[in-house]
């Protein structure tokens, strides 16, 4: 390779690297944040302690506050035998946290005028009827939402898994005429069947399957691209393996399940996807604001339920602490989602074991992060030095301009025959050393998030850096590469003697 070609190759590589880094930084919006190492270690200690106490194989945990992701991280293993670590993309069965999607879908259909919350269930499910004290009773959609229909919580326990009754329509026929525990509207009794019936109403009103309607009208618009519904016990690449404890040892568990229970229990999702759901719940777009607020509104009193005053549309509520939340439990999975719309934060814990330590962990995180401890973020610390970063930006911009002027002048001199390219082995060696320096700098930059923060990569870090730091970083990188270009120009050119 000639010196001239090497020179132009060096310049091209440097320019391309600088431009690509600048574009990548600019295109990332400030939607996430990152806890400092000390804060991260404190959070990790709390999480790992509770997971260990509960013998939980793996969990993924999400914390969102003020529209930013404070934490989205996996702990332990999604598959213990294969040593596959849990991550934000690991999908778990979220059990009863499916109900909030079902409830919101019903409210949206009511808003559109396609049903009325005071409609009798039998209006949309013609064959449906149930009795109280031997007399037929009318149950409304609102009573299903509020869990006050009187339908027993164990109504399907004697026929838990059958092929015959494995569809929504079939199971409602199977319980038709059964006895209610309470007169509709009088008492709260939590029953999955309430939300399974709501799923059937969604199907009958929209003429779509429940899963297809939720996917088309909620999951896709919310960019929850990897969220699905359980169809079999087969596990794909990103699906967590469910476990049950035998003594203190988690063992793989694949219990049978009912497809008709999908609207109340069988969504499969990750903290990566739930980030969109949590942000939507806390800060909904204007056209959905009233709908989301309605879904958090109390519908029934829940006397006897721990930490809850009332039940809303797929959520428990605690008015004293302004909390909206729900737990989810299956034989081999558990989940907990907690929202505080007033203080604008949300916590999600997904685990591949049914464990009482999941709600305990959420409680600990809620107490530690919000009420007592002041956890610092990298962004909050960097924000204290905005003025200094602005000065760096000005200085680096000046250096870039000087480098540009010098390079342009050198190009003009070359065009008019006032400079020549140097040709020597020493120059070639220096050029290769310059290229090696560029590569070394690129590798250091690539590893910088890990060296400073202990994990994460640029794609994550660049989403939460304050704009002042982004500008300082962009200009510093371009100034660095511009300086290398100037060095190359000095190495490769000399002024002709007149």
UniProtKB/Swiss-Prot annotation:
<dbReference type="InterPro" id="IPR050491">
    <property type="entry name" value="Bact_CellWall_Synth/Modif"/>
</dbReference>
<keyword id="KW-0812">Transmembrane</keyword>
<feature type="transmembrane region" description="Helical">
    <location>
        <begin position="433"/>
        <end position="453"/>
    </location>
</feature>
<dbReference type="Pfam" id="PF00144">
    <property type="entry name" value="Beta-lactamase"/>
</dbReference>
<dbReference type="InterPro" id="IPR012338">
    <property type="entry name" value="Beta-lactam/transpept-like"/>
</dbReference>
<feature type="transmembrane region" description="Helical">
    <location>
        <begin position="471"/>
        <end position="491"/>
    </location>
</feature>
<keyword id="KW-0472">Membrane</keyword>
<keyword id="KW-1003">Cell membrane</keyword>
<dbReference type="GO" id="GO:0005886">
    <property type="term" value="C:plasma membrane"/>
</dbReference>
<protein>
    <recommendedName>
        <fullName>Protein flp</fullName>
    </recommendedName>
</protein>
<comment type="function">
    <text>Its precise function is unknown. Has no penicillin-binding activity and is not involved in methicillin resistance.</text>
</comment>
<feature type="transmembrane region" description="Helical">
    <location>
        <begin position="6"/>
        <end position="26"/>
    </location>
</feature>
<keyword id="KW-1133">Transmembrane helix</keyword>
<feature type="transmembrane region" description="Helical">
    <location>
        <begin position="389"/>
        <end position="409"/>
    </location>
</feature>
<dbReference type="InterPro" id="IPR001466">
    <property type="entry name" value="Beta-lactam-related"/>
</dbReference>
């Amino acid at each position: 390779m000639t010196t001239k070609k090497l020179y132009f190759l060096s310049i091209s590589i440097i320019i391309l690297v600088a431009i690509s880094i600048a574009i990548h930084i600019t295109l990332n919006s400030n939607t996430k944040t990152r806890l400092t190492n000390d804060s991260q270690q404190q959070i990790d200690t709390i999480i790992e302690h509770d997971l260990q106490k509960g013998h939980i194989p793996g969990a993924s945990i999400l914390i969102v506050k003020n529209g930013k992701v404070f934490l989205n991280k996996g702990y332990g293993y999604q598959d213990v035998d294969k040593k596959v670590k849990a991550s934000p993309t690991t999908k778990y069965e979220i059990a009863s946290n499916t109900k909030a999607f079902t409830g919101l879908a019903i409210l949206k259909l009511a808003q559109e005028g396609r049903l009325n919350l005071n409609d009798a269930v039998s209006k949309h499910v013609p064959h449906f009827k149930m009795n109280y004290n031997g007399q037929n009773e009318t149950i409304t959609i609102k009573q299903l939402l509020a869990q006050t229909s009187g339908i027993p919580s164990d109504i399907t326990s004697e026929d838990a898994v059958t092929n015959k009754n494995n569809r929504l329509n079939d199971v409602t026929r199977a319980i038709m005429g059964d006895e209610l525990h309470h007169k509709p509207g009088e008492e709260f009794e939590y029953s999955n069947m309430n939300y399974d019936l709501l799923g059937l109403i969604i199907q009958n009103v929209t003429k779509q399957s429940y899963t297809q309607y939720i996917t088309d009208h909620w999951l896709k618009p919310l960019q929850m691209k990897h969220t699905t519904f359980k169809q079999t016990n087969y596990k794909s690449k990103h699906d967590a393996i469910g476990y049950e404890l035998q003594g203190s040892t988690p063992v793989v568990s694949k219990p049978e399940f009912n497809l008709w229970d999908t609207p109340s229990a069988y969504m499969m999702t990750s903290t990566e996807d739930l980030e969109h759901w949590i942000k939507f719940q806390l800060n909904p777009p204007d056209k959905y604001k009233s709908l989301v607020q309605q879904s958090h509104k109390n519908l029934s009193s829940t006397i006897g339920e721990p930490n809850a005053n009332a039940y809303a549309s797929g959520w428990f509520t605690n008015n004293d602490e302004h909390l909206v939340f729900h737990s989810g439990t299956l034989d081999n999975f558990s989940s907990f989602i907690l929202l505080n719309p007033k203080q604008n934060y949300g916590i999600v814990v997904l685990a591949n074991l049914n464990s009482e330590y999941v709600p305990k962990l959420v409680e600990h995180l809620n107490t530690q992060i919000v009420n007592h401890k002041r956890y610092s973020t990298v962004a909050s610390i960097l924000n204290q030095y905005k003025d200094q970063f602005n000065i760096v930006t000005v200085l680096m911009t000046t250096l870039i301009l000087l480098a540009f002027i010098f390079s342009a002048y050198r190009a003009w001199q070359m065009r008019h025959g006032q400079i020549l390219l140097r040709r020597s082995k020493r120059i070639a060696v220096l050029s290769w050393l310059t290229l090696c320096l560029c590569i070394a700098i690129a590798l250091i930059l690539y590893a910088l998030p890990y060296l400073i923060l202990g994990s994460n990569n640029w794609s994550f870090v660049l989403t939460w850096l304050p704009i002042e730091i982004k500008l300082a970083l962009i200009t510093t990188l371009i100034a660095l590469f511009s300086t290398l270009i100037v060095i190359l120009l000095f190495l490769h050119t000399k002024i002709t003697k007149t």
